[in-house]
Amino acid sequence: MAKILVTGGAGYIGSHTCIQLLSAGHDVVVLDNLSNSSVESLARVQTLAAKKLDFVEGDILDQQILDQIFKHHSIDAVIHFAGLKAVGESQKEPLKYFENNISGSISLVKAMERAQVFKLVFSSSATVYDEANISPLNETMPTGMPSNNYGYTKLIVEQLLEKLSAADERWSIALLRYFNPVGAHQSGQMGEDPQGIPNNLMPYVTQVAVGRRDKLSIFGNDYETVDGTGVRDYIHVVDLANAHLCALNHRLKTQGCRAWNIGTGQGSSVLEVVKTFERVNQMPVAYNIEPRREGDVAISFADNARAIAELGWQPKYSLEDMLADSWNWQKQNPNGFTKD
């Protein structure tokens, strides 16, 4: 088994991935600055996996902390989640995103190189694809100028890692292009708990259902889609976490840099998600239609054939499963990870 450094491991996707890593027998070190996460999530990770992990509170921009981690732990590979991810905020504060997501990633790989650690799984995004591409999106399609600055930072880091791998054959890098993670651990003890107003659909839906917010804001109902609302490929966070384990196992045995889409291959509109949530959970969700959000595209869903064929990965959970698990998490934890 390997020892894995997980940056951003206290966050939504990172924490679910830590459960998978620990349950598979790996040792885990988490580095997280807790800017959009809670240390309570890591306590629950260890309970659910019945195994301890090491936690370091700090930032990937801090070279000293990174060097200390690599000095004190015999790290075999890194899974890199740490970064800012709000599309709307990235349009308003681009420098903040460039520093955290691009400079932070450079800081991390420099520390990895100093420590002679060359195995990396990078948390990328389907937003790297040129918005002119027609879904289903596959990995051979051109990346292009993403429609928002968040996607731009992911694309730049992908390109940096590709060039790094081409220049130094010691590197083995997986670029996982996520579509839209939703759902929660089946125990109801882990889920998405954003700080402040949610930027993603599902925590907004569940917070309205549990009474924390009055209404859901749906951004745009004039897209050329089945009902005018945006269509996305929603994937269960447990399926996504398992994809990281599959990618890690693949990269531990191979060299080079390669991208994989991580999605179900099916698109659902925002209104379809809301109506399905109401049906599955017998809970009404009030909503308002708002103007389109800058940087959003009408339709985005994956061709996931490469990940299925090469990583031995297969998504297992349906949209109904995702929505049932999301609500199970929220109703058990109406205030998220806080105890009040």
Task: Give each language-model segment a name.
Residues 183-185, 222-223:
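Short, basic/glycine-rich phosphate-binding loops at helix/coil junctions
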Residues 8, 56, 68, 80, ...:
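Short, flexible active-site loop motifs that bind/organize anionic cofactors or intermediates
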Residues 187-189:
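Catalytic core of nucleotidyl cyclases, primarily class III adenylyl/guanylyl cyclases
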Residues 98, 147-155, 191, 195-199, ...:
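Short-chain dehydrogenase/reductase
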Residues 202-340:
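C-terminal substrate-binding subdomain of Rossmann-fold SDR/epimerase-dehydratase oxidoreductases
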Residues 1-184:
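N-terminal Rossmann-like NAD(P)+-binding domain of SDR-like oxidoreductases, especially those catalyzing
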